[in-house]
Structures are given as structure tokens and as C-alpha cells.
């Protein structure tokens, strides 16, 4: 846990999933402090919109103003809810919207934590363009190193005149005034042909590797299991290309597409609808934090390309949680398959959780591993 003192309220915050690390990563950053310093209670009129509030620092600080928390991360919503509870704040103080929803009209203040992907930022700025006014105060923040010329140009292109502040604690802010510059329409998704198939893969703004098949997934697809039955999970499904291939290779199986990103799950659904509509009755789509709340001993196999970062921080916390959830939800003799960068040494992590691990394939960058649930020891 970490403490954030600001002009609105003193907060105790923790990351989600919580960890027992000796030196845990902090649940807020200097950009959060810097953004809050710009505001005064007396100037906040109209709806408050907060975008990409990773662990709820801004939402908790401004809870008395009933803010809208907008983003593409279910884990961020869970983190915000947990931190509201931790600080004794009514959860209903914050309203949660995903990025593709309609934003509230005529907001008084918009606070944006600049996301990692420029495509997500553009989608969000275009959505804001429909609701902000020239009187809306628009402030964005990030680490100084993460604000580039392309970031500023995007604000200028979509919303209007843009300036930056001096750096403070290695954070920088962007101030923008809306004046409705001319702007051409943009497609909601980016699409590309998947080589070796007749499929067209559609990707919403925040999907990983949205402009082409990433090399890890490409390697994984060469070693996917075939002729499985029962229920299979594509965990952290992204655009669903792995699950789509599983549907094709395992005609007797049902595939459950799971991701914490609403845009990822929407992309997966769209890709099944457009490429294998006949398999929709063998498909399920779930926005979730890994397999939280899913009954144990349900699945025959889980396949996963786990992330090794959360927001801008390198961490294996999310992957570790995915592995534990997979083991709990697998049937006896059910199998977990993962692809990962070789340097992450997931072999020993899986062996610790499952008691076994087998290397299926390896190259100079990636490894495909399999672990089997042999009993109820955990």
C-alpha cells in the first residue's frame, strides 16, 4: 500500500491484483499528483470525466464530485472499487464506463492519463470531441518521457490548441482547449488478412498488436493442440486469433474468449462473427479479471499468452494470477498451454504451481510450455 496526500483527501492506495512483495509497485504516480494540483474544488462545475485511471487515485480523490471513470480495463475498475472501499468511500460515488460508451455531455473537467497506445488515445479524444465545449477544462498527464510530439499533435488535430507544462517529478501535463478543428472520420476498427487463411482480423483501438499478427502469437499458433473436446479458454484473448484457430482445429470443443479489455472481447466476438459465424454457438465471450468467479474444475484446456507488464510497469503479477486461476478452473488432467518470452522463466513458475511443466517448442525468443493439473493438491 502507498499513501497519496493531495488537496482533496488523504488516500491509502494499493495496486490490483494486490501483492505481498517486499517492495511493491506504487498504486499512483507523480502525474496523478500533478493533475490534482491543477484543480480547485470551487472551479469544478459540470460532470467530471476521468480517463485511464489505472488504480483509482484520481477517482478516489475526486469522489465527492461523482466522477465518471472511463477506460478499457476491467482490472482498473476493480482496482478503483477496491481503493474506494479501502478509503471508506461509497462505491456508488464513481460511475464506470468503457471507452466505447457514450460519454456524458458538457463536462466541466476532463482528466486524462495518457495511455500507452496512441490508437486508444485517438479513440478517446474523438469520443470527447462529441461532448466537450470550449469551457471544458481538459488536462492530460503522464511521465514526461511518455509525452511525445505525436501525442501533442493528436490533441491538436482532434480537439484544438494544446500546450505542455514544465516537468515536475518527471511528470508533464498537457492543457488543451476545444475549438472543433476540421477532422475526417476514422474507422472504428483496423483490419488485416491473416496469412494462410481466408480470415480478416478486426481490431478495436486498444487491442495488442492491432496492425498485424504479433510474433509470439505466430509461434504459438504453430503448436496449438488439436481434437480437444469440452470447453477451452483463450485467456487474455486480445483480438481472438488464438481462440479462432482453436475453434477451427477443435470442432468438438467450445472456446471461451476471456480478456479484461472490453475492446479485446468486442474484437474477438467480431472476428468469430465475420470469419466463423457457424462457430458462434461454440463460443462464449467474457470480460473478466483472468478467471475470477468462474467455477473450479470446468475447463479441459486453457491457452494463454500472458502479459509481463501492467500499465507502464514490468511485472509478472498478472501472469502469476492467470496461472493460479487456470489451475483452479481446469478439470483433473486438464492442460494449460502458454507462450512466453524465454527470459521470463515461466517454466519454474508453472512447475511450482502445477508440480510439472513440459517444453513443447522453443526458438531464440519464445517458448511454448504445457502444464497438467494432476490432482487437488492446491
Curated annotation (Swiss-Prot):
Gene3D superfamilies: Vaccinia Virus protein VP39. The keyword Protein biosynthesis does not apply. Keywords: Cytoplasm, Methyltransferase, rRNA processing, S-adenosyl-L-methionine, Transferase. GO terms for cellular component: cytoplasm. It is an enzyme of class 2 (transferase). Its main location: cytoplasm. It is found in: Cytoplasm. It catalyses: guanosine(1835) in 23S rRNA + S-adenosyl-L-methionine = N(2)-methylguanosine(1835) in 23S rRNA + S-adenosyl-L-homocysteine + H(+). InterPro entries: DNA_methylase_N6_adenine_CS, rRNA_m2G-MeTrfase_RlmG, RsmC/RlmG, SAM-dependent_MTases_sf, Small_mtfrase_dom. It comes from the Bacteria. One of its GO terms (molecular function) is nucleic acid binding. Its EC number is 2.1.1.174. NCBIfam families: PRK15001.1 (NF011577). Belongs to the methyltransferase superfamily. RlmG family. PANTHER family: RIBOSOMAL RNA LARGE SUBUNIT METHYLTRANSFERASE G, RIBOSOMAL RNA SMALL SUBUNIT METHYLTRANSFERASE C. This is Ribosomal RNA large subunit methyltransferase G.
Amino acid at each position: 500500500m502507498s499513501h497519496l496526500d493531495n488537496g482533496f483527501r488523504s488516500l491509502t492506495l494499493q495496486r490490483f491484483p494486490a501483492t505481498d512483495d517486499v517492495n511493491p509497485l506504487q498504486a499512483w504516480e507523480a502525474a496523478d499528483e500533478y493533475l490534482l494540483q491543477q484543480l480547485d474544488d470551487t472551479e469544478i462545475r459540470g460532470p467530471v470525466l476521468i480517463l485511464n485511471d489505472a488504480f483509482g487515485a484520481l477517482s478516489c480523490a475526486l469522489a465527492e464530485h461523482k466522477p465518471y471513470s472511463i477506460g478499457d480495463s476491467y482490472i482498473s475498475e476493480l482496482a478503483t472499487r477496491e481503493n474506494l472501499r479501502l478509503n471508506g468511500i461509497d462505491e456508488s460515488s464513481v460511475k464506470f464506463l468503457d471507452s466505447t460508451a457514450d460519454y456524458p455531455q458538457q463536462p466541466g473537467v476532463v482528466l486524462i492519463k495518457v495511455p500507452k497506445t496512441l490508437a486508444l488515445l485517438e479513440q478517446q479524444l474523438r469520443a470527447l470531441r462529441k461532448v466537450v465545449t470550449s469551457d471544458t477544462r481538459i488536462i492530460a498527464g503522464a511521465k514526461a518521457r511518455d509525452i511525445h510530439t505525436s501525442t501533442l499533435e493528436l490533441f491538436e488535430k482532434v480537439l484544438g490548441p494544446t500546450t505542455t507544462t514544465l516537468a515536475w517529478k518527471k511528470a508533464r501535463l498537457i492543457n488543451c482547449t476545444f475549438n472543433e478543428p476540421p477532422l475526417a472520420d476514422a474507422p472504428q476498427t483496423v483490419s488485416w488478412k491473416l496469412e494462410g487463411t481466408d480470415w480478416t482480423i478486426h481490431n478495436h483501438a486498444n487491442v495488442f498488436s492491432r496492425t498485424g499478427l504479433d510474433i509470439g502469437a505466430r509461434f504459438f499458433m504453430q503448436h496449438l493442440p488439436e481434437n480437444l473436446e469440452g470447453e477451452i479458454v483463450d485467456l487474455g484473448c486480445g483480438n481472438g486469433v488464438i481462440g479462432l484457430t482453436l475453434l477451427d482445429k477443435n470442432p468438438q470443443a467450445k472456446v471461451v474468449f476471456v480478456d479484461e479489455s472490453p475492446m479485446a472481447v468486442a474484437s474477438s466476438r467480431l472476428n468469430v462473427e465475420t470469419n466463423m459465424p457457424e462457430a458462434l454457438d461454440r463460443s462464449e465471450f467474457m470480460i473478466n479479471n483472468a478467471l475470477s468467479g468462474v467455477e473450479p474444475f470446468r475447463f479441459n484446456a486453457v491457452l494463454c499468452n500472458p502479459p509481463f507488464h501492467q500499465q507502464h510497469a514490468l511485472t509478472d503479477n498478472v501472469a502469476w494470477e492467470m496461472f493460479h486461476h487456470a489451475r483452479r478452473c481446469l478439470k483433473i488432467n486438464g492442460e494449460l498451454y502458454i507462450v512466453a518470452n524465454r527470459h521470463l522463466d515461466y517454466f519454474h513458475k508453472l512447475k511450482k504451481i502445477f508440480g510439472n511443466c513440459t517444453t513443447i517448442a522453443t526458438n531464440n525468443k519464445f517458448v511454448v510450455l504445457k502444464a497438467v493439473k494432476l490432482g487437488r493438491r492446491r
